């Protein structure tokens, strides 16, 4: 599958690629990383992972590639995959990148993908680099990516109703901390700006981001866990 997708990328170099085609291809490659496992991964997954591992992640080739694809996809979707709800604030599917990277790779990988994804978004948008929002997105990615800490093992096909509730609470708390506290504070420190507009953007971001990450994110996590559980069972039978 991955060879077909990479071949498609090479073919696109010879023609004009629409934003929809680019985003669709990005999601396919990204989700493929969630189900791909190298030989020996099954034995590794059977070992009890430490909380530290679920927070920091395992920075192997799979994680690095997943974070890189996630950051690129985040940057594209922040500009082309959303609906404007406030000044420079959108209801966007880019927020699902936090969910997938966090579920598959851990909290710090999700934070890194969100940080660099926002930097890429600023570069594509051409409105300058806003470090305050990049750090805010990294904080949110960290909260969202804590799934493994409370027992959600997406790679092993484990995601329960109780874990979904905990996830939803952390999404709300993470958005509130990231955009209600961290981003406004950094806006004032870095840019000495009046915070009225920033607080309006923060409120819109909290509501829109949490909505996407809960309403779409929870079914997506169940779907990924179910698919990985099926893949795990097939490999065990082999």
Where on the chain are the PLM-derived regions?
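Loop-helix junctions at membrane interfaces
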Residues: 28-238
């Amino acid at each position: 599958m991955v060879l077909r997708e990479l071949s498609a990328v090479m073919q696109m170099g010879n023609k004009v690629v629409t934003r929809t085609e680019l985003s669709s291809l990005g999601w396919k490659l990204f989700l493929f990383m969630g189900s791909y496992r190298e030989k020996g991964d099954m034995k590794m997954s059977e070992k009890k992972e430490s909380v530290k591992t679920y927070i920091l992640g395992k920075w192997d080739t799979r994680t690095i590639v997943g974070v890189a694809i996630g950051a690129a996809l985040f940057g594209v979707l922040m500009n082309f995959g959303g609906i404007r709800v406030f000044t420079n604030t959108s209801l966007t599917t880019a927020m699902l990148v936090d969910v997938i990277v966090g579920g598959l790779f851990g909290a710090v990988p999700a934070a890194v993908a969100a940080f660099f994804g926002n930097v890429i978004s600023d570069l594509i948008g051409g409105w300058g680099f806003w470090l305050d929002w990049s750090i805010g997105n990294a904080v949110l990615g960290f909260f969202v990516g804590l799934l493994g800490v409370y027992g959600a093992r997406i790679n092993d096909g484990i995601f329960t109703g109780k874990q979904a509730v905990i996830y939803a609470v952390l999404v709300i708390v993470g958005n509130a901390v990231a955009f209600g506290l961290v981003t406004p504070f950094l806006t004032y420190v870095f840019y000495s700006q009046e915070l009225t507009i920033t607080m309006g953007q923060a409120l819109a971001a909290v509501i829109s981001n949490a909505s996407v990450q809960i309403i779409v994110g929870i079914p997506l996590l169940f779907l990924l866990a179910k698919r990985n559980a099926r893949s795990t069972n097939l490999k065990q039978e082999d």
